[in-house]
């Protein structure tokens, strides 16, 4: 096995909070932060693919994994690939992850998320008492919002797509870091 840990720009930490003191400003800052993280993640994925022969990596076996903001990044990248957005152009044609593992993640979308293509198999873990990343959804402005693991899995079930969903009852955002810390 080969494990690669990627880094990405964390825009919200670097922005003056006064820039997103209202809902519209926050919505814009959130979308920009997620876009930057996903772009960096895509570039890192592409770098891995470009060096796959040298590093003896099978690009068809790359699994994306993240927790909290990293889970949002991994899920959003898969969502962008499935919807053939400009993000997908950063990657080789027909590339998709072999799977995505998400600890307390969500997808950012304008309106209810729509999947043009079915996603790769997803494994999601989320506490139903999470007040940081929504378990189901958090509409930020009009229809733009974060659509959490519970909502995503309802869609995957309807699409009859491969997924596993572990609901940690009564657990908050600690599920985003406890598997890495406690195991």
Which residue stretches match the model-derived regions?
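Serine-hydrolase catalytic machinery in alpha/beta-hydrolase-like enzymes
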Residues: 1-57
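Structural recognition of the beta-strand scaffold that forms the well-ordered cores
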Residues: 2-7, 61-65, 98-103, 121-126, ...
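Active-site loop signature of alpha/beta-hydrolase-fold enzymes
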Residues: 11-13, 108, 131-132, 173-174
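Short, solvent-exposed loop/turn and secondary-structure capping segments
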Residues: 15-17, 75-77, 112-115, 134-136, ...
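Primarily recognizes the serine-hydrolase "nucleophile elbow" in alpha/beta-hydrolase
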Residues: 39, 43-118
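The feature captures the conserved acid-bearing segment of alpha/beta-hydrolase catalytic domains
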Residues: 88-160
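C-terminal catalytic histidine-bearing segment of alpha/beta-hydrolase fold enzymes
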Residues: 157-183
